Amino acid sequence: MVYSSIKNIRHILIDDINNLPDLTCKKLLFVAQVGDVGYDIPLINLLAKLIEKDKGSLVGSTGALLIHSVDDHGTKRFAQDIVYIANNMGCSFIGHPLVEATGSLKNFSTWQKTIKMPLEDICYKLSKKLVRRLMIDKPKDLKSGKISVLYSSPHKTSNTLDLWHLVSKHITSFEINEIQIERGEVLDCIGCPYKLCLHYGKKKGCFYGGVMTENVLPAIEESDAIVWLCPNYNDAIAANLTAVINRLTALYRRSNFYSKSIFAVVVSGNSGSDSVAKQLIGALNINKGFRLPPYFSIRAIANDPKTIFQVENIDIKSEFFSKIITNNIKV
């Protein structure tokens, strides 16, 4: 899997955590063998060493992942963990940054409908394609453009929305479109057959129609970046926004999201903001293929309404995150 993807490409193998080179401004391929416990412990140790060395150890770098598991579990979850950790050290990730190979390789079965090859050969083919996309990835900075903001929280009581407005007041060079997803306004995806979904997607629509077709999908299509405002509901993304993510398939069928960046504002009453951030990584970067900029999320703990304003250094953190957004929207 690894050999076939890096053949004829100059590379450096890093496997000694006590002799780590400078990994800033590099193309990084994270390779993991997920064991019975669901982790690649040596890779976790390497990432821990990088954090210990410098929390900005991966600034300016872009990553992708090849992950193999001894069974049919753990690849996707561990990928989210790696991306989350590396992203918090300044690493960005291309859209669809992962090729995962479960123990049985059955996860490649659906590919056989379009690629008439043995499962193992499909694995090698996709791995090679991923590394090629990583190597040629050279996005350009965008100094002005459009940002769509999706949220479902009520205006009067939302710490998440308040935090976003602390951030957005510093963003002046981009046009911002805030879209509230009201309760029950977006029905979840019913899983239309592929051809039917493709049919509606080509017409810039969806079987259900409604606010998704009239407002959300056109806004995302026109935007250079999408900011997701996610209060932590039981360590999960709010149901309304989950429905939006699921319904993006209609647009995704028609064109990829590789040139669109995602950011997140996550507020928890207690803990668990990392759980929500990882779900966004899994759904939007790994599955749907949005670009993941470095330090893509700002996270805070605030329970009662308006207590976000009492969080230590929140104004400084908000202004810093606004610069993360404006400096990392690339096409």
Where are these regions (language model features)?
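FMN-binding flavodoxin-like domain, especially the glycine-rich phosphate-binding loop
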Residues: 1-175, 217-222, 228-230, 235-331
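Hydrophobic pocket-lining residues within nucleotide cofactor-binding pockets
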Residues: 181-184, 232
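Cysteine-cluster motifs in flexible loop/terminal segments that predominantly coordinate metals
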Residues: 184-217
